UniProtKB/Swiss-Prot annotation:
Annotated ranges, domain KH: 560-619
A Gene Ontology term for the protein's cellular component: cytosol
Statement: the UniProt record of this protein carries the keyword Flavoprotein: no
PANTHER family, per the entry: POLYRIBONUCLEOTIDE NUCLEOTIDYLTRANSFERASE (PTHR11252), POLYRIBONUCLEOTIDE NUCLEOTIDYLTRANSFERASE 1, MITOCHONDRIAL (PTHR11252:SF0)
Catalytic activity: RNA(n+1) + phosphate = RNA(n) + a ribonucleoside 5'-diphosphate
EC numbers, comma separated: 2.7.7.8
Protein family membership: Belongs to the polyribonucleotide nucleotidyltransferase family.
Localisation: Cytoplasm
Residues reported in the UniProt entry to bind Mg(2+): 493, 499
Gene: pnp
Name recorded for this polypeptide: Polyribonucleotide nucleotidyltransferase
Amino acid sequence: MSESQLSLTPVKRSFQFGQHQVTLETGGVARQADGAVLVDMADTVVLVTVVGRKDPAAARDFLPLTVNYQERTYAAGRIPGGFFKREGRPSEKETLTCRLIDRPIRPLFPEGFRQEVQVIATVLSLNDEVDADIPAMIGTSAALALSGIPFEGPIGACRVGHLDGEFVLNPTFSQTAESDLDLVVAGTQDAVLMVESEANLLPESTMLDAVLYGHEQMQVAIDTINDLAAEAGKPRWDWQPPAKNESLDSAVAELVRSDLEAAYQIADKQERSERVGALRDKAVEALADEEREGWGAGDVGEAFKTLEKKIVRGRILAGHPRIDGRDNQTVRPLNVQAGVLPRTHGSAIFTRGETQAIVVSTLGTGRDAQVIDALEGERREPFMLHYNFPPYCVGETGFIGTPKRREIGHGKLAKRGVEAVMPSDEEFPYVIRVVSEVTESNGSSSMATVCGTSLSLMDAGVPLKAQVAGIAMGLIKEGDEFAVLTDILGDEDHLGDMDFKVAGSKDGVTALQMDIKIDGITREIMEQALDQARSGRLHILEQMNQVIDKPREQMSEYAPRLLTMRIDPERIRDVIGKGGATIRGLTEETGTNIDISDEGVVTIASADKAAAEEAKKRIELLTADVEVGKVYDGKVAKLMDFGAFVNILPGRDGLVHISQISNNRVENVADELSEGDSVRVKVLEVDRQGRIRLSMKAVEEE
């Protein structure tokens, strides 16, 4: 080997993961990153890199972890569209995958770790049957395990499907399309940390079995990562958690504890927040003294936060009422309204305590469908759900712009919650857009969106299979003691150990999302959470059904009316015409919108039913076959020496030979007919070339 050649000796490990072989490779690519892994799962290849900054952390009270997941079009052998011909801002799929990676790894960084960490997952090659999200999650876990950054992993991750009553590990895209379940689960060797799923009204027991099945199956990935890290991992950073400042904790408790306990018994969120904020300011002002005690404002703030957590959690575990006075199983007071906006196609306001959403549904035609240029291929999405979380909903000011990751994630969760009960395109050929405007928020606005969406769609006349509702559960756990909380507040979410969101109908679960911050969540705890969630969901559904319990039979007068018909695909060109002239004239003259699929399904949209019927009639004429023996009312289009051409259907002319004009002898065609004359003709013959022979004489004889 010459001296100019560089020797790369990557370390590889492989394992069987369902129907796919997975290979992890490190040491050959991106060697300047703290950790870098190439993951190959049946030709879907993802490069995951991790870099952590070792310089002293700035004064901050959070972990500055950034996760970027990026899909390159070359991975699927394609060139990007658009003027610049390069990838643009992250797609919804990329944003959701970033969240999917972030959620299970964030709780595994040690408490007090404040160094900046960046994860970048890049899809380099795509098998269009294998989603890149699971390889990206496994690669992130492996790269962190190799990096030496303090991390209490590794984690494993897998997708679980449900086909023919059996669980399927890491189903392909084709299998997922047929599956009753699409569930992604991630966790450590001992505990489940995250679940993201949608289901076709499955029972709670099946959902729980799927979570535990996935956790069991992912152990092979965790073992392989441990094996890879043992051979190729870097030394663990020499990082020590900041020492507990017990004297500061005691000083804060002595100063504000009794007042803080009283503040956390104020039911009104804004009043409580103002009181807690004032107590925090009091503690900082009284105790922050860098020169004398060495306590900065940030240190006092951390100690105050620790005391808050102790007070709220301690009261709940001791059996005292929650912050707003409820017991652990009570849903907040509800207010349900449907049909609240006069000109929209469907609308609802759903209020649960201090969480409220105005949800509006709009019906459109096929041309309104969202075109998604996904890596695995282009597709059209006929159902959209958008979630907006403006700053005023929590009493704050802030920047209004493009949707943030959280808004995209919450919108997707709400969409998962209702997708199982949506009608098929054949049952309801409209494109549907739902927008949720969160107008108040104190916990679980995504589940309020699920409830509001169901109400709004029913108000719009969309034939849902069932009414659906969603609820968020929480958990407080200390040692063997635990309390499962129904319909959590924002503070309970922030100070608790689990966020467990469940959506569904009275018959089963449609969506389940779970984020767990601690180890030790047992089957018993998850069963209790699902059981309480079902009780809460049924209570909410009962209240919703009192307002509207089935889709309205009459749609809004402002919604478009759709007529559908099927034509021979070979006749599509007759409807469209040369350069689109025919269909353009048809839409302008009737005031309708017309969409034609490649299969010959014609959808006519108009707010005026009569106009839609007129367009349908014209299309039937354009595509009708000429019947031999049938009499048509036609118009003379052109005179010739040997006869006249008569238009009997749009675009269809036939010849009346001079001998077929009259029973009397005709010497000159112009003596009997003029262009534009209306005549009745009978079809005598259509030859192999499609030429039509007509007769006026045969009509006279009849």
